[in-house]
Amino acid sequence: MKQISGRIYIIKFIIIILFIIIFWNLVKIMYFNNNYYIKILDSLTEVIVEGESAPRGRIYDRNYNLLVDNEAVPVIYYQKTKNITNKQEVELAYKMIEYIDLDETKLLTRNLKEFWLVNNQSEANSRISKEEYQKVKKRELTLNDIENLKISRITLEDLSKYTEKDKKAAYLYYLMNKGYSYEEKIIKDNASDEEFLYISENNDRLGGFDTKITWKRKYLYGDTFKSILGNVGSIPKELKTEYLKNNYELTDIVGLSNIEKEYESILKGTKAKYIKKGNNTLEKISSAKRGNDIVLSIDINLQKEVDNIIDTQLIRAKSEANTKYLNKTYVVIQKPNTGEILAMSGRNILKNADGYISYDITPYTLTDPMAPGSVVKGASMLVGYNTKAIQIGEVTTDECIKIKNKPKKCSSHQVGRLNDIVALAESSNVYQFKIAMKVGKANYKYNEDLVIDEKAFDIYRKTFSEFGLGVKTQIDLPVESLGYIGKNRAPDLLLNYSIGQYDTYTPIQLSQYITTIASNGKRLKPYLLKEVYEPTKTVELGKLAYKIEPIILNYVDTEDQYLKRVQEGFRAVMTIGLGKNVMGNAPNPAGKTGTSESFIDADNDGKIDTETVSNAFVGYAPYENPVMTITVTSPGVEDPNTNISFHSYVNRRIAREISTKYFEKFPIN
């Protein structure tokens, strides 16, 4: 027994010692090492969270004129709380209209009916028959069908009981439930100071209502070039997954089109970051930072001049005969040897009760192709030289070509005997037809069948593609089309191809073509982004982050003497040929005019079936050491199916006036 008692005492002693040790450790944790363990707990429970979207980068033109800035917008928003019911949201809406001024006239009848439905479920249910409910069980009707039936059976008399206050609450309820349930709902932007302050100070007891400062874009030159600058907005539903993968939140504002979209990664701001600690406090670890600023190659004042000239000349042309289908013109001005776009404009005019009104359609310079006509004869001539179908200075007779069962194919006017330079100057179709037949290894005889080697199409298209025709120019914008590339390889179509009457090209493709000629065969990527600057907290530009260097896509595969000969031909166009005075006071210009048969969708039925005549012009100046290239295209300048022979020179006038204006602004010393 004494042994057992001794053991018990020993065990008791050990237990007491253990309790003392445990107690001492608790004292150390609670008093001596308290801060240490709090830090450990915080590190295990802290979460990094981001603040609201930061402002986007600013956009400038090449002369550092500010084009796009940010404007702070005070916003009231609603975030649905967990387990809130429709009835509770209705009550919340009635409460909040006391503090938020909303325009209930924007409320649609459908929205008001949905509000009535939430408040009168029993009555609405009674308006659905047993037979209709049975159809749901039989899967002849869906629950959505039943909801629509309920809505349809709400009468104007039901709604007439609603007061102005009820309608305000109904409109707020609609805003609270628009879109996905998990999304923040913008209730009001540009909130008043009183509204913003009240909700900011009381957000903890307003059931999901809160405030924030967001940013909207401010365009300092109005609509000038705005369509290319692009839009910003909420993430499109179809791109939700892609943006989430890139660490965006669904409430973020992103670039949706053109420059804003193309350079989203540069322009987007960096959100502030906070550590959310275990005690629900926030500690800022990095501040919000505006996105990088970008400088474009565009000269905004030149752009304004171009827009105004096109508008004026299009409206003038509509007073001329036979311009029924004329309603748009495109212009692109580039800088040779770099590819920079100095101005790019598309203008569309429509008639209204007060006359004509113009619209900006500049994005269509990348997607609206047309048959360019004779402007491509420089590339066609090069095919002839490269394949040895002709020699420099070769003389032939301008005479109509006749293929069996086909109409005669002639030049617009016969010149008689002519060489390659005169052929370009006078825009001889026949000269090109004869080259095409030689390239196609044809044995031509008047009014007999024409057989060609179809590989001739590939030979032509390869050379054309080296100028940017029939391929993407790789301009730094999200959308660009190739134009139409004909699949039929009939012999007469090869002849048509050689004079720009088969495949179609966009204005930007034609601009790359003439810029390649002006740059001695160097095909450059056309671009709008010129420089990127780090953001600052002032109105001044920050540190230069990087500058865009010209990108050479390829060189035209030809001999220097051949390209030089084409350039001489383009110079002759402007001195002795059909292009005299088309570039006005531009010094020593070179270029090429073009007229084509083209087809348009005149009645907007989706079918391109109305024959018209279109005009194009491409040029550059000065001939030696060019500083600019210009491309002007005007579809539908003439209706050929009338008894009126008048043809408007609107395309030439636009080219002349813009070229003159350019060199007035930027004279050559």
Predicted regions and their residues:
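Short, basic/aromatic recognition patches
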Residues: 39-51, 302-324
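A short acidic/glycine-rich loop-to-helix N-cap element
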Residues: 636-651
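Solvent-exposed, polar/charged alpha-helical surfaces in well-ordered, non-transmembrane soluble domains
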Residues: 90-94, 98, 197, 201, ...
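Short, gly/Ser/Thr-rich active-site loops of penicillin-recognizing serine hydrolases
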Residues: 539, 649-669
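Membrane-proximal periplasmic segments of bacterial cell-envelope enzymes
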Residues: 1-261, 265-286, 329-330, 336, ...
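Beta-lactam-recognizing serine transpeptidase/beta-lactamase-like catalytic domain environment
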Residues: 66-69, 74, 273-289, 298, ...
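Structural motif corresponding to the C-terminal cap of alpha-helices
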Residues: 309-318, 349, 443, 574, ...
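Short conserved micro-motifs at the rims of enzyme active sites and ligand-binding pockets
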Residues: 239-241, 600-604, 631, 640-644
